[in-house]
Amino acid sequence: MARKKISVIGAGNVGATVAQFLAAKQLGDVYLFDVVDGIPEGKALDIQEGAPHWRYDLDVVGFSTSDETKYKNMEGSDVIVVTAGLARKPGMSRDDLFDKNVEIISDVSRNIKKYSPDSIIVVVSNPADIMAYALQKFTGIDPSKIMGLGGSLDSSRFRTFLAKELNVSVEDVNAFVIGGHGDDMVPFIRYSSVAGIPIENLLSKEKIDEIVKRTRFGGGEIVNYLKTGSAFYAPGISITAMVESVIMDKKRVIPCAAYITGKHADHYGIRDKFIGVPIKIGEKGVEQIYDIDFKPDELELWKKSVASVEASSKKVDEWIAKHAH
């Protein structure tokens, strides 16, 4: 059986951590790309040299894209993970990264389109829902093959905080977060439970509100501690879960930024944009989008999230119009 091929573009903390987790889970050969000379080669070699202890017989190889022809090495990738971009610094919101990152995504997109347009693509560069939209616009790739990190990580944080508060195994906590991957995310209390028991039966409203707030600013909390960068271990494993569901055709249901169109657009009140919703992930990418019903207070939060995504997506359209040759 031919081994799968996974390309990771961006060998910073997130990209390198993803590369290590993908290898550790033996999901396929990992090709790591970065514009900084030596970084992808060095990190890939370091991951490769741990193979005897991790017990993976896979190739982990790095390529510096300061020579753009090196992108040719991602040809025929089953999955491409795009983490290239600037990391957040204290005081920055995910949206502050917009201008720099859309430029980086434009370069990456050109090379994906040229060398590996049939891959399933996971977009991580912040703001991920907006960068997924930009990548789709730049490449023209079928949007069902593109998904953005967001809810997968936010839900993981939400589940962690709930499990710690209740002193139960994280495995028994089911919870999810939808909407934009930003301060407008919508943690869904009603659909959150411990072994099927609604969390509203287990925690006071005040305590739940506190956990929701911490989830919403979970990324910022880590940025404030680290000072020079943002989270990478939890994002790394959240991305790995998405890739694993594609490679193994697991059909996992995970909230991610997906392209909303057709009847889903009527339901969610947003059309032809990427926003975080529960999706089924399999070998074809986004295989199903689930429509969930909102109560009035949830709908209010959702609409706020939609407005924020619409405004940022419009900035992408303006950027493209300005830079069209």
Curated annotation (Swiss-Prot):
Active site: residue positions: 181
Enzyme Commission no: 1.1.1.37
Biological process according to GO: lactate metabolic process; tricarboxylic acid cycle
Substrates-to-products reaction catalysed: (S)-malate + NAD(+) = oxaloacetate + NADH + H(+)
Keywords, ordered alphabetically: NAD, Oxidoreductase, Tricarboxylic acid cycle
Pfam families, A to Z: Ldh_1_C, Ldh_1_N
List of residues binding NAD(+): 10-15, 34, 101, 124-126
Top-rank EC class of the record's enzyme: oxidoreductase
Binding site for substrate: 88, 94, 126, 157
InterPro entries hit by this protein: L-lactate/malate_DH, Lactate/malate_DH_C, Lactate/malate_DH_N, Lactate_DH/Glyco_Ohase_4_C, Malate_DH_type3, NAD(P)-bd_dom_sf
GO MF annotations in UniProt: L-lactate dehydrogenase activity; L-malate dehydrogenase (NAD+) activity
HAMAP family registered for this protein in UniProt: Malate_dehydrog_3
Family statement: Belongs to the LDH/MDH superfamily.
Functional summary from the UniProt entry: Catalyzes the reversible oxidation of malate to oxaloacetate.
This protein's name: Malate dehydrogenase
Species this protein is from: Thermoplasma acidophilum (strain ATCC 25905 / DSM 1728 / JCM 9062 / NBRC 15155 / AMRC-C165)
